[in-house]
């Protein structure tokens, strides 16, 4: 609040999906936010963009998972809903650890999905190295049982926000508290505080 009162532009930057981060944004009185791992931009409380994952990369990952009998779920919108054609993911690794609405439909055709925001694979750490399409998209492992593909470009989100604001990049000061914030730290561009 003191930074805002002093005339500074203040912005939350998170890897979380927009729908998840909104509560925190409002609770801590941020009008502006970079979310969805750098792919979402909220300006003055309004979601301006929320770019999905690269579709071709997503399709390759899901196809390989299906060929190898690996359960998958996909987030195709900005909500806690995940979609799949069966419950193979749940059979293999159990339910996800966060609030989730499962929409499982044998007629679900992932090739007809317009946008993918996250992909969850029932792929443990030992199998991960042999998954050929892993590098098609950024991935993170918060749970040992499954691998999650989601945007991971908070630094890119900072660039987008500054471009929208038409503000100099060297004015940026970032604060981070964990390894997932390292992407934002670039001493050659701006000031970072850990």
Predicted feature residues:
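A generic structural motif
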Residues: 6-10, 169, 188-190
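Short hydrophobic/aromatic-enriched beta-strand-loop microsegments
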Residues: 30-38, 94, 140-142, 191-194
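Structural motif
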Residues: 28, 187-188
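Conserved acidic, metal-coordinating active-site core of Asp-based
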Residues: 64, 68-187
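Active-site phosphate-binding/coordination module
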Residues: 1-89
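Short, intrinsically disordered, charge-balanced linker/junction segments flanking boundaries
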Residues: 1-2, 109, 191-194
């Amino acid at each position: 609040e003191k930074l805002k009162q002093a005339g500074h532009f203040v912005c939350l930057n998170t890897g979380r999906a927009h729908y998840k981060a909104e509560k925190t944004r409002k609770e801590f009185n941020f009008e502006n936010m970079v979310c969805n791992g750098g792919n979402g931009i909220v300006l003055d409380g309004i979601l301006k963009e929320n770019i999905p994952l690269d579709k071709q990369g997503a399709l390759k990952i899901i196809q390989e998972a299906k060929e190898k009998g690996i359960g998958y779920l996909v987030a195709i919108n900005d909500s806690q809903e995940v979609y799949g054609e069966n419950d193979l993911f749940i059979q293999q690794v159990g339910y996800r650890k966060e609030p989730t609405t499962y929409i499982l439909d044998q007629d679900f055709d992932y090739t007809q999905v317009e946008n993918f925001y996250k992909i969850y694979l029932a792929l443990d750490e030992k199998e991960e190295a042999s998954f050929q399409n892993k590098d098609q998209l950024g991935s993170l492992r918060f749970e040992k049982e499954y691998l999650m593909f989601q945007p991971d470009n908070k630094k890119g989100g900072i660039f987008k926000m500054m471009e929208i604001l038409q503000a100099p990049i060297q004015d940026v000061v970032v604060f981070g508290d964990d390894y997932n914030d390292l992407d934002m730290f670039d001493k050659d561009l701006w000031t970072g505080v850990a």
